[in-house]
């Protein structure tokens, strides 16, 4: 994610793709309330632009967030200044005792970190187990096979007031790999006048089989 989520893509992701983070925050706050941890610390892996972290802070939870994208962390620090937000791979994240560890938005499936495809996730899950307080929660989602139906690749277009994004998705069922090629368009100020730029993020891949199997 350090390459794929540069300044423009981080801006667009924050502006137009925050619904999942907001919904997840509502769910996690309720789960922690039911678990008797209404003020418990939350460690958010792949914290993105801080939408989730801000909602947890507003609900009274201390938050530590990790993200490998400097652009995402910069946005998150503006949105959630009360959170402890750290730049780096979640595979190396410090995990203090906590009520919950979260990894929302399929971040455990991304292959930007080489360790995700190897034994890195096994070690991470073991450390999460050690960090969670009794009754603590691990909340995450992963990419599932079959995302692309019909002819591959598939293209989609989405736009907002000052941005647009073109996404091309290709799935290799044999290799269990999903690849996204993303082109962003964003209106930006230039010398006091309106301007625009287009950027193509490096293709990002995720592995639907990345999360360790647990019986």
Q: Each PLM stretch: what is its role?
A:
Residues 1-37, 51:
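Conserved class I S-adenosyl-L-methionine
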Residues 139-214:
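SAM-dependent methyltransferase
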Residues 22, 70, 118-122:
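Non-membrane alpha-helical structural segments and their capping/turn regions in soluble enzymes
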Residues 99-119:
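A short SAM/SAH-binding and catalytic strip from SAM-dependent methyltransferases
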Residues 93, 109-111, 147:
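Short glycine-rich, flexible loops that bind phosphorylated cofactors or substrates
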Residues 119-134:
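A short glycine-rich, Lys/Arg-flanked "PGG" loop and its adjoining helix->strand segment in the class I
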Residues 40:
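Nucleotide donor/acceptor-binding cores
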Residues 43, 49-93:
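Class I SAM-dependent methyltransferase SAM/SAH-binding core
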């Amino acid at each position: 994610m350090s390459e794929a989520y540069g300044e423009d893509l981080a801006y667009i992701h924050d502006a137009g793709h925050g619904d999942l983070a907001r919904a997840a925050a509502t769910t996690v706050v309720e789960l922690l309330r039911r678990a008797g941890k209404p003020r418990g610390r939350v460690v958010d892996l792949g914290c993105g632009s801080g939408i989730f972290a801000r909602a947890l802070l507003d609900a009274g939870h201390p938050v530590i967030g990790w993200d490998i994208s400097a652009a995402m962390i910069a946005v998150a620090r503006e949105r959630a200044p009360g959170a402890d937000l750290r730049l780096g791979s979640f595979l190396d994240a410090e995990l203090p005792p906590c009520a919950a560890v979260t990894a929302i938005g399929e971040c455990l499936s991304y292959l930007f970190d080489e360790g995700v495809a190897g034994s890195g996730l096994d070690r991470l899950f073991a450390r999460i187990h050690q960090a969670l307080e009794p009754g603590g929660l691990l909340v995450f989602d992963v990419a599932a096979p079959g995302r692309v139906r019909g002819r591959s690749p598939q293209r989609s277009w989405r736009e907002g007031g000052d941005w647009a994004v073109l996404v091309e998705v290709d799935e290799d069922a044999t290799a269990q790999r999903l690849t996204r090629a993303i082109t962003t368009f964003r209106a930006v100020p230039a010398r006091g006048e309106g301007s625009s730029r287009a950027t193509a993020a490096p293709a990002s891949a995720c592995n639907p089989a990345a999360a360790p199997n647990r019986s």
